[in-house]
């Protein structure tokens, strides 16, 4: 089953910076001081400069494809494809302007031709097409200039050669979507090596490129049945390296979006391979620091699995409880949101298995001093389906959360949270008034016993303190008392001389 992905937008071309001057060797200070300030973000750069062909011949415009007879069409098409395989330096804004314009016009014409003209895609042009695409898009991505790059706050490095690169991606996409496209011919050239290099490009910092790659990889997955297992396997490897080794990969969200539509098309019953992917890859992905960048796509994949096989619910929820964040409130709010999505599709028979540990965690969230965490946890009681599950299992859920709700209603600093807790307690009272009264009496008795124990503990410590003081005073009194001197014994002379 194939999900229609939205086409990428066509943004404007970014400005290309010039090359910074290099100081002569005798002026280089090997012991220059490092500034403690954070460096200003540099503008876009790319590995395109390393692919520039400095000794290339000047490009000249070729005739339009629509102006030549049909007998010469494919020869001219091959010449234009070869022309589009010439690379230019986009870091120099004024270099080879004529050649860049000739290539841009040729790419535009190829895009229109492959999308509108029938009978163009014959077998002999396939190697030329794949060669042109490969030369343009496959390159070594530059290392990130900012090792602490935050996708939510920092501006990404944009690809300077995007005016040409976008047209190449658009041509590739229309090539795959053309009615004349023959997967049986293309599979000789779009092989495992090609797919692996395509997946490596997902680490590009340019979001425009990743958007095109997402759509193209989805089309490749749909067209080439023999590559499907390989694509899934390589995605697994990327995710596992991201979790346990690199902790940085720019295209996680896009790959998860593709996998979401792939999971949606899985046949039932699910294969063991697919279940292992959920347990060993998707669940551990929740432990990554940059979860907020791709959490929406990750949660969608998890929910898709549970809709396919409800028996996986216990593994998923216990896995989420295992990776539940302890110190990051933003991630905690995301976990609560995902948990509500899971509970929206959970089967009542599966809810019984996880209700106690789940609602103990929800109770801990309600008691959080961060009001957004407490508020998000209390919103569970606004969901009608979750509320019906709670009502059916009130004898288990209510004891798990009652003590926390009652205590937080008396102690929380935020009045909104207190009001929400009162509403939840009122709902519980309406669900099962008898159980509510029993828990209230039990809670008050428990508090009285705790107060009594605390009082006894204080009295015990007070008694120990008094005993210590008495012993201290006794020791000091013994030191201050005079020590009696021994009486000397007089030798009896008995009157003898």
From Swiss-Prot:
What about PTM? Ubiquitinated by CUL3-KLHL15 complex; this modification leads to proteasomal degradation.
What spans are recorded as compositionally biased (Basic residues)? 34-45
Q: Which cysteines are joined by disulfide bonds?
A: none
Cellular component GO terms, alphabetical:
cytoplasm; protein phosphatase type 2A complex
Task: Spell out the Low complexity composition-biased ranges.
Answer: 1-19
Which keywords has UniProt assigned to this entry?
Cytoplasm, Phosphoprotein, Ubl conjugation
Q: Which InterPro entries match?
A: ARM-like (IPR011989), ARM-type_fold (IPR016024), PP2A_B56 (IPR002554)
Biological role? As the regulatory component of the serine/threonine-protein phosphatase 2A (PP2A) holoenzyme, modulates substrate specificity, subcellular localization, and responsiveness to phosphorylation. The phosphorylated form mediates the interaction between PP2A and AKT1, leading to AKT1 dephosphorylation.
How it assembles, according to the record, is: Component of the serine/threonine-protein phosphatase 2A complex (PP2A). This complex consists of a common heterodimeric core enzyme, composed of a 36 kDa catalytic subunit (subunit C) and a 65 kDa constant scaffold subunit (PR65 or subunit A), that associates with a variety of regulatory subunits. Proteins that associate with the core dimer include three families of regulatory subunits B (the R2/B/PR55/B55, R3/B''/PR72/PR130/PR59 and R5/B'/B56 families), the 48 kDa variable regulatory subunit, viral proteins, and cell signaling molecules. Interacts with SGO1. Interacts with AKT1.
UniProt-recorded name of the protein:
Serine/threonine-protein phosphatase 2A 56 kDa regulatory subunit beta isoform
Question: In Gene Ontology terms, what is one molecular function of this protein?
Answer: protein phosphatase regulator activity
Q: Does the keyword Disulfide bond apply?
A: no
From the UniProt annotation, give the residues forming the signal peptide: none
Family that this chain belongs to: Belongs to the phosphatase 2A regulatory subunit B56 family.
- Phosphoserine carried by residues: 32, 35, 44, 46-48
What gene name is listed for this protein? Ppp2r5b
The record ties this protein, via SUPFAM superfamilies, to: ARM repeat
Location comes to: Cytoplasm
**Residue span of region Disordered:** 1-55, 473-497
